[in-house]
Design a protein with these regions (language model features):
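Conserved alpha/beta-hydrolase
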Residues: 144-164
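A fold-wide structural signal in alpha/beta-hydrolase
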Residues: 58, 81-84, 148-155
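N-terminal cap/lid segment of alpha/beta-hydrolase-fold proteins
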Residues: 31-77
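Alpha/beta-hydrolase fold nucleophile elbow
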Residues: 191-204
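Accessory cap/linker subdomain of secreted extracellular hydrolases
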Residues: 35, 87-149, 214-313
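Short beta-strand element of the alpha/beta-hydrolase
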Residues: 63, 73-87, 198
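Alpha/beta-hydrolase active-site loop
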Residues: 135-143, 149, 171-191
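Secretory targeting and sorting signals
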Residues: 1-20
Length: 313
């Protein structure tokens, strides 16, 4: 990964100019070739639920995907790494990845998702996401095996307070942004990393990658965010001037429910994380006030920095 490539597809449909490729387009050609080429490595090796300890002691959980030989042994070569930090639990990404590996199932599912159109309904904002599926959206949301089998490592991390990670969900806030920088630094220092990190993701994971780039961590060399946003009212709640109140409650409910799904493997192994449970019970339905704030706060940053005061101001 070289240079800084930013492809922004915003929810409003307005394209944001990408940063020019300093190689004159050579990097884009190389990226496409790597993503679309036949697999260079026959297998993918996965390290499940690898702990990453943040500076405040909170432990986040990550799955690490690396190219492997026919026996399933990961290659020894240090590789560029693609990072995705998600609030939707790695378990969902694993499920999507597994479905895509079933012969004869992936294509019909992708076609169905791409055909969904919620225009004119309270769920209008979802349409942009479903239409991105046909262009490789699921690989960006979950695991991109094409990249892994062609010489990249991929790290998928449960954001603080979601999935199997400890802590309280700090939606796109200062602590979560600091976590992103620390995860990037941790990734760059692993033996399987060549020290260069890129980020990709859709929607929430697109926004946190843009935020991470703004912090300019030394190891972050590129981001590819699909469907990020900044103004919740214009991008989600009132897209095009039509008020749609269905998405935000559904989204908050989804994340708040998914964060209670436990790590079954750790339970079976007698290694259940009791702090994880304590953190969930302490904040069972976080960010309900932010749902109301979405109608008045100018930007996502306002809600993240001033979650309980933006309406009053």
């Amino acid at each position: 990964i070289s240079g800084v490539l930013v492809a922004l597809l915003v929810a409003s449909g307005t394209a944001v100019p990408a940063t020019a490729d300093p190689t004159g387009g050579a990097d884009a050609v190389a990226w496409t070739a790597a993503a679309d080429a036949p697999p260079q490595y026959p297998q993918v090796a996965i390290d499940w639920d690898v702990p990453i300890t943040m500076s405040d002691g909170t432990v986040l959980q990550a799955n690490i995907y690396r190219p492997a030989d026919a026996s399933g042994r990961p290659v020894e070569t240090a590789l560029p790494t693609v990072l995705n930090i998600t609030p939707y639990t790695k378990l969902v990404g694993n499920l999507i990845d597994s479905i895509q590996q079933i012969p004869g199932v992936s294509e019909p599912v992708l076609d169905f998702l791409a055909s969904l159109n919620f225009a004119g309904t309270p769920f209008d904002g979802i349409t942009d996401l479903t239409q991105a599926v046909d262009g490789g959206g699921l690989r960006i949301f979950a695991v991109n095996r094409n990249l892994v089998q062609n010489g990249y490592a991929q790290v998928v991390v449960d954001a603080r307070g979601t999935g199997f990670s400890q802590g309280t969900w700090d939606v796109l806030g200062p602590r979560e942004q600091q976590d992103s920088a620390e995860i990037i630094d941790w990734t760059s220092r692993q033996s399987w990393s060549d020290g260069t990190v890129g980020m990709s993701g859709i929607s929430y994971s697109a926004i946190n990658s843009v935020q991470a780039a703004a912090l300019r961590p030394p190891a972050l060399k590129a981001i590819f965010p699909v469907e990020p946003g900044n103004d919740l009212l214009r991008d989600i709640v009132g897209t095009g001037g039509a008020l749609g109140v269905g998405f935000m409650p559904l989204w908050l409910t989804l994340v708040n429910v998914l964060k209670f799904v436990p790590n079954v493997q750790s339970i079976l192994q007698g290694q259940f994380d009791t702090r994880w449970l304590a953190d969930r019970l302490a904040d069972p339905a976080i960010l309900i006030p932010e749902l109301a704030n979405a109608f008045t706060a100018p930007t996502i940053a306002d809600i993240a920095l001033y979650p309980y005061t933006s309406m009053a101001e």
